[in-house]
Amino acid sequence: MRKVFIPLLASVPALSVAFLATLAPTSVRAVPSYARQTGLPCSGCHYTPPELNPAGRKFKLLGYVDKDKERPGLEIKDESKSHHAGLDLLSSLPFSAMFETSLATTKTPQPGTQNGNFEFPQDVSVFLAGAWADHVGSFLQVTYNAQDDHFSIDNTDIRYAKTRKVGGKDLVYGVNLNNNPGVEDLWNSTPAWGFPWIASDSAPTPTAAPIIAGPLAQDVAGIGGYAMWGDHLYVDGAIYRSDHVGNPQPNSGSGLGYNIRGVAPYWRVAWQQLTPKAQYELGAYGMHMASTPGAVVGLEDKYTDTAVDFQVDRTLFRKDVLSLRGTYIRENSTLAATFAAMGAQVSSHHLDTIFTNAEYHFGNRLSGTVGWFDTGGTVDPLLYAQSAVSGSANGNPRGAGYIGNFSFFPMQNIQLGVQYTGYTRFNGAAINYDGAGRNASGNNTWYLLARFIF
């Protein structure tokens, strides 16, 4: 799993981060160590991996600590009584591993490169995923990526959670440590855990993306608190600092597109309604960040993201599930630092991003998904500069298209997937978008994946 944050040189605008970082493969998994801990199959918490069902959302909310009652924690005996050790260790440590191999081909080869990229592996991951103690658990992933040829920390979510009664209803509350804004979320409608579930790491992707939709992933460290009241109202808040893993510490900011000044606050609120055959969620989330690109002092670029999202899961024909999801993100930014460095033609910018998708789960073995995405915003020939394949001839950040995915799970820990991504706009145009003769449709991508997790 490659990181979705792409470090930028100080002279490169901070907004020039791959838009499809938001469409890159995310780290959410049906991790077998959870199944071993709870005694449940993967379908106990997922419609089809990685989409969480109500039980899966509850398991995450409670800090990944629920256990099979037939497999108690480690007991220490003395002459007078038996009692649970304070660490409540499992009979086996909560480790899992994953192997992915893939084949990707674009309609038009990238200049000077071969088409049909076969990666064996694309990613190899190890997970520490499960209960650490009575109220503490984690989803922690370390990934080797063949493109980077090294291991790195991937999406990580460590929780402390408890429950009490408030107003006659259950209040679940907790503290969360994570490295990606939104990674703590319970639904699959927001960018951190959103569709597509798989994607090529070699195919071209559009340039522009809101900061809340991928550019900060695995490049920040955050702490926050969350609560769910009555299985209806969910609130979450966190603050983030830059954490440039793999770079010298203390941080100098050199060569990095985002260096958070102070802290960057993140907020989330959602309402869910549960019925015997359907679950509904409607929410909002956002983030504010001040950053000094390429340094830790000086003029600042400021970003404010505000978003709304929804998710509907409806059971059909007893075992099938239809899922509808979507989010709209508005980003307003003032790029004083980038403008002063002549990296932008104007200082005030905005981006508007929409992701929507519909998925049909045929039991827990097959799923088909169709998604649509669209990002547009302020035209700026310096911020979105011209270059072959990755640039824009007109300075327009528009990127739009569709994704079709079909996944088959012959066993609960094996996924075979085929996916097609088509572009109607790429970096501002459909025809000759880069000024070098490449069309948006030239980046249309077929992608095949085999994933094994155990």
Region spans (language model):
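The canonical Cys-X-X-Cys-His
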Residues: 39-50
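Outer-membrane beta-barrel "beta-signal"
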Residues: 41, 408, 414, 440-454
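Outer membrane beta-barrel
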Residues: 53-54, 90-106, 111-245, 261-277, ...
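Sequence/structural signature of outer-membrane beta-barrel proteins
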Residues: 102-109, 143-147, 165, 180-184, ...
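Transmembrane beta-barrel architecture of outer membranes
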Residues: 121-123, 151-157, 170-172, 220-222, ...
